[in-house]
């Protein structure tokens, strides 16, 4: 027998081993040579190869507020289709291409769409980016020494070197000594 594949962009053959190389349709012809008792014979069949569903997966990401921008990278990817990213909450993370920029604490679901290619269907998946709150940096809030009977005085709020908008509150560990 001899085999012939019409479109070798779809399949190739070596002996009687057929290897699929792409999605689409082609015909395969098998031919048998004549012998003393039989004429030459051939038979053609059609081979249809469907596009595959690609594997596309991402790990969830945990960052801290103030972290630098980072690239969202696939954990597993079988297709070469282009990727587009979109986020559910830009106040937490904004997306430009595959770069994520941390904007605030919270969680955002990132949807990733992959385009169709010659051999793979389009697909989509998602991941969650969680941004943790961080402790603010406070300085210039020093111990105070006073003498009993001194008049009341104003406590100056500590200075901060961040964009924290939280309100300062004060409390005394021993209200019998000092009250606020």
Where are the regions that the model predicts?
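Solvent-exposed beta-strand/loop surfaces, strongest in extracytoplasmic domains of secreted
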Residues: 1-180
């Amino acid at each position: 027998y001899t085999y012939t594949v019409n479109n070798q962009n779809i399949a190739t053959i070596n002996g009687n081993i057929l290897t699929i190389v792409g999605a689409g349709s082609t015909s395969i012809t098998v031919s048998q040579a004549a012998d003393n008792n039989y004429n030459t014979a051939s038979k053609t069949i059609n081979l249809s190869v469907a596009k595959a569903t690609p594997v596309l997966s991402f790990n969830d990401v945990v960052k801290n507020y103030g972290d630098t921008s980072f690239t969202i990278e696939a954990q597993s990817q079988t297709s070469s289709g282009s990727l587009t990213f979109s986020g559910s909450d830009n106040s937490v993370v904004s997306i430009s291409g595959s770069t994520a920029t941390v904007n605030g604490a919270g969680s955002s679901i990132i949807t990733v769409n992959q385009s169709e290619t010659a051999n793979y269907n389009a697909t989509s998946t998602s991941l969650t980016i969680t941004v943790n709150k961080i402790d603010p940096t406070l300085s210039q809030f020093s111990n105070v020494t006073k003498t009993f009977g001194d008049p009341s005085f104003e406590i100056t709020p500590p200075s901060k070197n961040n964009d924290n908008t939280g309100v300062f509150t004060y409390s005394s560990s021993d209200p019998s000594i000092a009250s606020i």
